[in-house]
Amino acid sequence: MALPRCMWPNYVWRAMMACVVHRGSGAPLTLCLLGCLLQTFHVLSQKLDDVDPLVTTNFGKIRGIKKELNNEILGPVIQFLGVPYAAPPTGEHRFQPPEPPSPWSDIRNATQFAPVCPQNIIDGRLPEVMLPVWFTNNLDVVSSYVQDQSEDCLYLNIYVPTEDVKRISKECARKPGKKICRKGDIRDSGGPKPVMVYIHGGSYMEGTGNLYDGSVLASYGNVIVITVNYRLGVLGFLSTGDQAAKGNYGLLDLIQALRWTSENIGFFGGDPLRITVFGSGAGGSCVNLLTLSHYSEGNRWSNSTKGLFQRAIAQSGTALSSWAVSFQPAKYARILATKVGCNVSDTVELVECLQKKPYKELVDQDVQPARYHIAFGPVIDGDVIPDDPQILMEQGEFLNYDIMLGVNQGEGLKFVENIVDSDDGVSASDFDFAVSNFVDNLYGYPEGKDVLRETIKFMYTDWADRHNPETRRKTLLALFTDHQWVAPAVATADLHSNFGSPTYFYAFYHHCQTDQVPAWADAAHGDEVPYVLGIPMIGPTELFPCNFSKNDVMLSAVVMTYWTNFAKTGDPNQPVPQDTKFIHTKPNRFEEVAWTRYSQKDQLYLHIGLKPRVKEHYRANKVNLWLELVPHLHNLNDISQYTSTTTKVPSTDITLRPTRKNSTPVTSAFPTAKQDDPKQQPSPFSVDQRDYSTELSVTIAVGASLLFLNILAFAALYYKKDKRRHDVHRRCSPQRTTTNDLTHAPEEEIMSLQMKHTDLDHECESIHPHEVVLRTACPPDYTLAMRRSPDDVPLMTPNTITMIPNTIPGIQPLHTFNTFTGGQNNTLPHPHPHPHSHSTTRV
């Protein structure tokens, strides 16, 4: 598959642009141009042979394998499996950023999958509520994919379509009615193909790119599909909250994979200027986080504003979900260290000890996070993720990317399935307990919990059919779906579209027929994945044992067309029109639907199902309950009950003790029935015959709250406006403790759970440099606090990450982060961190 001559000017221009970008290295312009042009000639002269597919990359030659697909409308693909994109992160490189792979001299066979990153898939310890239904229902199949584990796991898989364009054109001219000759064929004259990099989900703890076969999507959409392995769990996201272990190694793996892709995908016929990242669940939140990181900037084929990728698709996951970021990483690092017998009093010794432990010993430890949260995941380190994702979005850090995102109709299925007798509906007592448990685990403001609990019950009760257990089950499913997925996705779409950046929103309303899910289930978390990958076109698989119908095949073709169109142009409607007559003669209703761009005003979204339509304001009432009313209820409660609770700031000569007798235990566990006994919390839903004073009180309270909020809004208009403007330039954060006190002190001493909305700005200004702050001097916006559990108040801030542990006097900076030499990968962390001034309005 040789690149056409018409692409010469395009690649020459890219080579020249690359020279301009790399001119800063000091090399003479003549030599730079000569080297880049020689490399361009090498790329153009390569030919991908279908019989013996051999590609020469920057690191050596690799041989792939040709695979035929079980569908006559799908051409074969060439698979390159187990391609290394980074060096093994083993030994002293554990808990360090990735380095480039070592070159190889012989031909490397890329015909089978590489080992997966270490993980422990044990039924009963998995966060089932955050995993796809097909994942948890087929653990035996998933386990077969993750048997071969190794820390040497940083590999990717490449799926390249190989259909001969000329042969297709001739056959379509001779037989226009042939199935392969569909209207607006997706072949585009053999030019460089768009690239789609899939990031797998799994709550940052489980999964592998090997699970997801990109062959059908690549063949049908005429795009190159890449799946990636990245470090998971403790090995990918352990953080001590300081320089000893900054965390986010899994995200840095993904960035390295994207850098490898941008520098090598041209050898496979791919376009380095049309790279789209997409993922589902935790993979979707990774996609969102990558759009917010300055490490995603920089592409050798263009100027730095183009980035390592240009478009992003976040399926059922954004950076604003409660489980997207770990706000208490140091606590879980100490819990793990205690379990394996490492010293927790010094973070440097802790990390050195963990580096020497067998990886299996670390992975096998059961470190349970607070419910609806994660123990080991991305952290706000002040570098890879410079600030809270919501703040970064408000500042426009992701405005340069085209973004498509959406949710499934019934994401929260697993939350409801875990309730007793959910198949027969949900009883009033179970409903009450589920809501109470939900509030207790997500909101750390005890003064207002009763009002919040009753407000949620009131809003999620269908008063026209409130005695029906099945109706109660439906509303409870909506509660979990709205809070954990819908509201964060809508908030993300609003923030992105506010900058005029192309934004597309969808709601997925279809799932395949299978006996593994209850009949009452809607499209659950992860149910869109088989349709994106084109599984219905090749029939059931072990992982997706569905009874696929022609409607499933049609819908999969529709979804793949939208996704690949977006990867090609940033517009899901172009260039390929929706036409599935090659499947059956039944009209495709998507042909008459134009997916309109999303804006905060209209909030238009595409309903993806058998009856597609463009609608507006998806679940607006419930979304605004979570984004507007609930944060203001907290604010109102704090204003009405506020008393000064500011902790006295001790002088620096006071040494914090590792523990106190009255300190709260650092371990967290799921709430028990004893803790949240519904009998101790009378509910209006527990019995049928009762007075309705509670509901009336809640109604009056909500109404009074809204009235009072309107009054407050006028009174505080200018104050909030000025505060918002100043917060963009100056956000208060905790002062650093001396030496290693961050890890010595319990979390409750470092950050107060009672973050009051008061005039603490004045307190910030009055704090002297020599003072040690034991609590958040300037509390974050309440909308940010909504994602944090009672024991997950954030330790990480942009300032705390720059700390260098120095419990030993005169110690030198430890665990220097590896840098990439030779001009490659030179934007990953450097040994001596210094404050990074990231642009808030990249253009």
From Swiss-Prot:
Gene Ontology terms, MF aspect: cell adhesion molecule binding; identical protein binding; neurexin family protein binding; PDZ domain binding; protein-containing complex binding; scaffold protein binding; signaling receptor activity
Q: Where in the cell is it found?
A: Cell membrane; Postsynaptic density; Synaptic cleft; Synaptic cell membrane
Instruction: Please list the GO biological process terms of this entry.
Output: AMPA glutamate receptor clustering; AMPA selective glutamate receptor signaling pathway; calcium-dependent cell-cell adhesion via plasma membrane cell adhesion molecules; cell-cell adhesion involved in synapse maturation; cellular response to calcium ion; cytoskeletal matrix organization at active zone; establishment of protein localization; excitatory synapse assembly
The cross-references to PROSITE patterns, in alphabetical order and at most eight, read: CARBOXYLESTERASE_B_2
Spell out the Polar residues composition-biased ranges: 661-670
Q: How does it sit in the membrane?
A: Single-pass type I membrane protein
InterPro entries annotated for this entry?
Answer: AB_hydrolase_fold, CarbesteraseB, Carboxylesterase_B_CS, Neuroligin/BSAL, Nlgn
Extracellular topological domain residue ranges: 46-697
- Provide this UniProt record's keywords sorted from A to Z: Biological rhythms, Cell adhesion, Cell membrane, Disulfide bond, Glycoprotein, Membrane, Secreted, Signal, Synapse, Transmembrane, Transmembrane helix
Quaternary state and interactors: Interacts with neurexins NRXN1, NRXN2 and NRXN3. Interaction with neurexins is mediated by heparan sulfate glycan modification on neurexin. Interacts with NLGN3. Interacts (via its C-terminus) with DLG4/PSD-95 (via PDZ domain 3). Interacts with GOPC. Interacts with AIP1 and PDZRN3.
* UniProt protein name: Neuroligin-1
Gene of origin? Nlgn1
